[in-house]
Amino acid sequence: MDGPAIITQVTNPKEDEGRLPGAGEKASQCNVSLKKQRSRSILSSFFCCFRDYNVEAPPPSSPSVLPPLVEENGGLQKGDQRQVIPIPSPPAKYLLPEVTVLDYGKKCVVIDLDETLVHSSFKPISNADFIVPVEIDGTIHQVYVLKRPHVDEFLQRMGQLFECVLFTASLAKYADPVADLLDRWGVFRARLFRESCVFHRGNYVKDLSRLGRELSKVIIVDNSPASYIFHPENAVPVQSWFDDMTDTELLDLIPFFEGLSREDDVYSMLHRLCNR
């Protein structure tokens, strides 16, 4: 059974002790450290990811260039050829439909699923909130899903303030039924899955320019910096969540988003907080 091919997750440090952390985990570690220092403002911790995980993304209009290809004898290939990975331009057809009358004038918040709102496992979890059957290679497997504390309050308030979109790098066969159970209020106006991501240098990236919304009015909430590498200035990072039932990350975010909903554009407030 190829579980990781169905669900896109970060590694739970409890299950992988002794492994040296990679760059993609630095943001999570930074948030863990700040979690222990609750005397500091919760808002300032959102932006530690930009300080400790400084990924320079290529401009959307420019190709991404890798180092020259080297032959086995150490020489460069003919013409010093380089691998060029183009960053896709906005498509003729955007990922989201037109804004509804209900959401007219609201900002768009893109919300991740795994380790942001829930944690899922193919291993049995005694206190699972949901058990979702998923078909893999003709066999039905059970996925055990834990809800992050305060996710219900968070989603309900976000649905009142914003046009909310679920955007996950996991496959729809798993994520869609989880969203059915999680979102009892119809908060998510749209759901985007792995096929809507851009595969860039080994990561599934959520390219916000493909949504069809003005970028100055788009926010992404995600535990993985690789997911928003094209638009880090639009991100509100969150700590990866696995099973800590005392976690208050989502609850702490609500006042922040209440303030953000009143801003003319997201960059001004995010920039101010980043430089506090």
UniProtKB/Swiss-Prot annotation:
This is CTD small phosphatase-like protein. Keywords: Hydrolase, Magnesium, Metal-binding, Nucleus, Protein phosphatase. One of its GO terms (molecular function) is RNA polymerase II CTD heptapeptide repeat phosphatase activity. Recruited by REST to neuronal genes that contain RE-1 elements, leading to neuronal gene silencing in non-neuronal cells. Preferentially catalyzes the dephosphorylation of 'Ser-5' within the tandem 7 residue repeats in the C-terminal domain (CTD) of the largest RNA polymerase II subunit POLR2A. Negatively regulates RNA polymerase II transcription, possibly by controlling the transition from initiation/capping to processive transcript elongation. Interacts with REST. Monomer. Mg(2+) binds at residues 112, 114, 223. It is found in: Nucleus. One of its GO terms (biological process) is negative regulation of G1/S transition of mitotic cell cycle. The record marks 168, 206 as: Transition state stabilizer. The gene is CTDSPL. Coiled coil: none annotated. Expression is restricted to non-neuronal tissues. It comes from Homo sapiens. SUPFAM superfamilies: HAD-like. Its cofactor is Mg(2+). InterPro entries: Dullard_phosphatase, FCP1_dom, HAD-like_sf, HAD_sf, RNA_Pol_CTD_Phosphatase, TIM50. Residues 1-25 are annotated as: Disordered. Binds 1 Mg(2+) ion per monomer. The keyword Translocase does not apply. The keyword Iron does not apply. One of its GO terms (cellular component) is extracellular exosome.
